Structures are given as structure tokens and as C-alpha cells.
Amino acid sequence: MTTAFRATLAAGALAWLAAAPLPAQSGAGPASYPPQTRFPGENAAAVARHLSAARRLAGSDLLPEFYWRCLTSPLDKATVFQIQHNGLVEPTRVFDQLYSVGQNAVSAWALDTRDGIILIDALNSADEARDIIVPNLKKVGLDPARLRYVIVTHGHGDHYGGAKYLQDTYGARVVASAPDWAMMERPGRGPFAGLVPPRRDVVVKDGDQVTLGGTSVRLYVTPGHTPGALSLIFPVTDKGVAHVAGLMGGTGGGQDSASVHQQVASLRRWQALTTAAKVDVPITNHPTHMAANEKLALIRYARPGDANPFLYGQAAYRRFVGVQEQCSRVQLARMGETGDD
């Protein structure tokens, strides 16, 4: 490392610290520090029981997934906002026909077929579709004019925000369940106030398929996170070797007791569906749910012979779904319930 390079690096680090001081260096007192979320009515014994079950299922290889879903996400919102921020991520070919083309906070996946592209989720807005998805498709060698379908996994703005732009610009068909079409068509709130949804197009039912260019994506309605969250099973290959990917459309938990109970039931059903389909690849619609951005970096810097980090294997995928279920049961226990059936 040259002296000039060290000087440049040091100057950059000092500039970063000056622009964004760490909380401990900001001069603010402890009274201003954000607390972890508290659950005063929780059933502590049930929380402990389901946390223990989730941790056992996680083993050592799925600890990041366990930590995020069971602990970090519900307990430490400040960390969630720091990690799950809007940011640019290098688009990456993950499987022979599957590409990550989203951003740091939320995923978008392009499934390439001989007759066009199926896009899974459309980020937050028309701006992100135009300035992130479209350039990312081009960077990995895909022509956005070949977009044929946009599958919206659930009716939150960060997943359908760019769908209308892609519908209007490229004529892509937009796919969602009936409950989540209705959800998208209601006026948005908070950061999604004023967001214009896509025109209602393809309404799918549980068990339907979207087929394009010989590739079929099976769709299942898995309520919980939203009333009509869609979960997907589809084939991929890694250097020509066949695998099966599974994307649970709403792993972020429910909003109240009833929706979390729905989530638990959906995850149990998803376990059966993905076991029967021999799913061995997890795909998520937020990178944080499986440390996906870290895995993308491993792929970009892979050496010959390195394993694809998205290949979990069937047994590990079953444990992954089991962790999600137990973490939903933890959520119920934090509401004061047992978390049991």
C-alpha cells in the first residue's frame, strides 16, 4: 500500500466520520439512545421455548437467519433501519437463469426463459424500477424489453412500487392474488401514500402456475404477512445441475394475533409443499432474511470450485422453514400467547 493511497484512505475515513458520527461519538447522552423493543405482556416461558426450538433447528449454518427473524428484527428496530436501508447492490447471476436485480433493502429477481423474463417483485417505486431494475437487467446481459411477467409476492409498496412503470413501459403482465390486488388498490399510507398501483391484470389462485418459455412457476396463497401473500416454487440450474427454488412470499411476520396464526399455518403448509417439491434453494424478497447480499458478494468473488452459497440442500431448507415457523410462534408468545397450536 503506497503512502499516497494510505493518505487517500485516511482522508476518506475522516470525511465519513465527520459526516456520519457514530452514536457514541455524537455527544448525545444515554437518555436519547433508542431502547430495544419491550413486550410487557409476553409469555416469557413460551418465548424461551420457541426460541430454543428455533435455535436448535438453525444449528450453526442458519444462525444468521435465526438471529434476524427471531431476535434482531423484532427487538432492535434501529439496527433494522441501519442494515435494511435503500442502497445500490451489484446485480448478480445466482443460477444459470436467475439473477438478483434488486437493491439493499428489498429484492427483485429476474428469471430468464427462452421466451422472456419473469420478474419477481418490483421494488419501491417507478424511479427504482427505471433506475435500478432496468439498468441491472442490462448489466447482467438481459434486455428489459423481454419482460413478460411481474409477479408481486405481496401487496406492500416495497414489492409492487415499480410494477406500473414496467407494465406501462414494457407491457409486462402483473400477477398477484385477489386479496393483495385489493390491498394494492387501497390508498397507500406512510412512505407509500400516493403510490399508484399497477392496473389489475392477472389474478391467480392457490396452485396456479405462470408458464413462460418452458419454465413454470407454481404459486401458492400463503396468508399471514398479508392476506394474499404469494409463495413460489420454480426450477433453476447451477452449472447445468437441476435444483428447485422456494420463495415464501411473506416471511416478515403478521400484524396481529390472527395474522400471525395464519402465518404459522401457512409456514406449516409451505413446509409440506416444499418438501414434496424437493426444494433445496431458498430465495427471499428481502436480502436480510437470509444474508443474501453477503451471499451475492461470495458469488461475485467465487473461485473455481467454490460452492454456490444459495444451495442449502433439502434438509437445510426444511430447517430454514422450521426456523421461520418457530420465530412466528415466538411472535405469538410475545403477545402473551403460548405460541402452540
What are these regions (language model features)?
Residues 120-121, 146-155, 175-177, 221-224, ...:
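Active-site neighborhood of phospho(di)ester-bond hydrolases with catalytic His/Asp-centered motifs
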